[in-house]
């Protein structure tokens, strides 16, 4: 049999999430469930979805790996569209501080938070970062993640920012998971520039961004647009430079306070704005009107004991919601897709179908890849997840438990649960 060739036969459900762009508003509930279906992946590309009888008239079983999905549901590979998975050091002590009532900004202002991770990441060698990040990707694939977005932003200097991006470059070549790289030098102001934000912004714009764009080290530029971090005007300046250099843009917006990050994302035509815990009604509407994906990160709100983002309002206003884990060493040290799914459906008033769209086709749209991943459509990459159970509704029902049995990436089995 040829590599990249697989037939998944007799699935109780194939949830296609069909489409080549993000799903907005009511369309998020349309996940297109096909009962008793099979899927053909040839040379890593999805070729057919239909009955096994019809498929075997066109394709010779001898040339394919056969996976029996009887009494199991098949979905598109999950897309985790917001993570910070390349970092050095840990921040377990800060979790205790938060439990004792200290806020995210309290911890950041006393030298914890992002700048704490910056110290650990600067000290780590490229090989050390590579090995630790590889283990994290191994864990993610067990949850059904076949594509992940990863950010720099724990360097905040020229050498370490590029080091983080080059680690992701190496992992893209060596690991099954596809990686969308985001430059986030504007994650915080480093200690050596404290009180000199303008100088640091000029350093990013004049020295780092041009190098990242020239070497194509990242597809996206992201900025932490937040009170006490980067203002709306500072964020606009950085993001406009990134656009000028040919990069796509996204924002950490309105996470801690209502600053106007959602409105800025709409103004600049960002691909996504993320977090949005305190986004204004006007910002939510502007994002929906301008087709900016709202990437929501429920595990972070949960860990920070903050109110959840208003997913229901965003969808009802005609917006598109994606879900990401925000896996990072501080505010959300978890890559658990089951936990994220449970929080989205139980606490954010998302339907099961909306949450599935948010983890698949809208996650793909949030990183500009909805034409090639995020749904089970002919011509897309053969990235598929097989659940242990016959229905997608078991995802929240078996609350917080990983029910992924098999993961297929580019038509190859890359994970199979051992019982």
UniProtKB/Swiss-Prot annotation:
Residues that, per the record, bind Zn(2+): 82, 84, 252, 326
* Annotated InterPro entries: Amidohydro-rel, HutI, Metal-dep_hydrolase_composite, Metal_Hydrolase
Q: Does the keyword Lipoprotein apply?
A: no
Main location group? cytoplasm
Residue numbers binding Fe(3+): 82, 84, 252, 326
Q: Which Pfam families match?
A: Amidohydro_1
- Which GO terms of the molecular function aspect are on file? imidazolonepropionase activity; iron ion binding; zinc ion binding
Kindly report, in one word, the top-level EC class recorded for this enzyme. hydrolase
Q: What is the lineage of its organism?
A: Bacteria, Bacillati, Bacillota, Clostridia, Eubacteriales
Q: Which SUPFAM superfamilies match?
A: Composite domain of metallo-dependent hydrolases, Metallo-dependent hydrolases
Residues the entry annotates as binding 4-imidazolone-5-propanoate: 91, 154, 187, 255, 331
Q: CDD domains under this entry?
A: Imidazolone-5PH
**The EC number(s) this enzyme carries:** 3.5.2.7
Task: Cite the binding residues for N-formimidoyl-L-glutamate.
Answer: 154, 328, 330
Q: What is this protein called?
A: Imidazolonepropionase
Reactions it catalyzes: 4-imidazolone-5-propanoate + H2O = N-formimidoyl-L-glutamate
Question: What does the note accompanying the cofactor annotation read?
Answer: Binds 1 zinc or iron ion per subunit.
As recorded in Swiss-Prot or TrEMBL, the protein's gene is named hutI
The record's function comment reads: Catalyzes the hydrolytic cleavage of the carbon-nitrogen bond in imidazolone-5-propanoate to yield N-formimidoyl-L-glutamate. It is the third step in the universal histidine degradation pathway.
Q: Which GO cellular component terms are attached?
A: cytoplasm
């Amino acid at each position: 049999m040829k590599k990249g060739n697989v037939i998944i036969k007799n699935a109780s459900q194939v949830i296609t999430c069909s489409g080549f762009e993000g799903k907005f508003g009511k369309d998020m509930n349309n996940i297109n469930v096909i009962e008793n279906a099979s899927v053909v992946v040839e040379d890593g590309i999805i070729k057919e979805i239909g009955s096994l009888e019809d498929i075997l008239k066109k394709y010779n079983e001898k040339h394919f790996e056969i996976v029996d999905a009887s009494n199991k549901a098949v979905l598109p590979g999950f897309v985790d569209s917001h993570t910070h998975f390349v970092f050095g050091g840990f921040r377990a002590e800060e979790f205790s501080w938060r439990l004792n009532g200290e806020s995210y900004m309290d911890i950041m202002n006393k030298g914890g938070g992002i700048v704490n991770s910056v110290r650990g990441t600067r000290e780590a060698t490229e090989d050390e970062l590579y090995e630790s990040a590889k283990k994290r990707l191994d864990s993610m694939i067990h949850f059904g993640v076949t594509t992940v977005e990863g950010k720099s932003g724990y360097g905040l200097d020229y050498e370490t920012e590029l080091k983080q991006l080059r680690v992701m470059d190496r992992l893209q070549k060596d690991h099954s998971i596809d990686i969308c790289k985001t430059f986030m030098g504007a994650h915080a102001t480093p200690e050596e520039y404290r009180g000199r934000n303008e100088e640091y912004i000029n350093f990013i714009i004049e020295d780092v961004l041009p190098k990242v764009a020239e070497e194509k080290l990242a597809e996206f530029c992201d900025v932490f647009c937040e009170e006490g971090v980067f203002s709306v005007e500072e964020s606009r300046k950085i993001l406009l430079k990134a656009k000028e250099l040919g990069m796509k843009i996204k924002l950490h917006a309105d996470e801690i306070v209502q600053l106007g990050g959602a409105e800025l994302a709409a103004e600049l035509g960002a691909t996504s704005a993320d977090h949005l815990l305190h986004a204004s009604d006007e910002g939510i509407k502007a994002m929906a009107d301008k087709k900016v994906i709202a990437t929501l990160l429920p595990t972070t709100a949960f860990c920070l004991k903050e109110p959840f983002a208003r997913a229901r309002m965003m969808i009802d206003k005609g917006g598109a919601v994606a879900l990401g884990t925000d896996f990072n060493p501080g505010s959300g040290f978890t890559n658990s897709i089951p936990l994220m799914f449970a929080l989205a459906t139980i606490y954010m008033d998302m339907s099961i179908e909306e949450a599935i769209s948010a983890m698949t086709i809208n996650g793909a749209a949030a990183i500009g890849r909805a034409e090639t991943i995020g749904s089970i459509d002919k011509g897309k990459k053969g990235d598929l997840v097989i659940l242990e159970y016959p229905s997608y509704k078991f995802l929240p029902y078996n609350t917080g438990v990983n029910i992924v049995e098999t993961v297929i990436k580019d038509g190859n089995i890359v994970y199979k649960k051992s019982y």
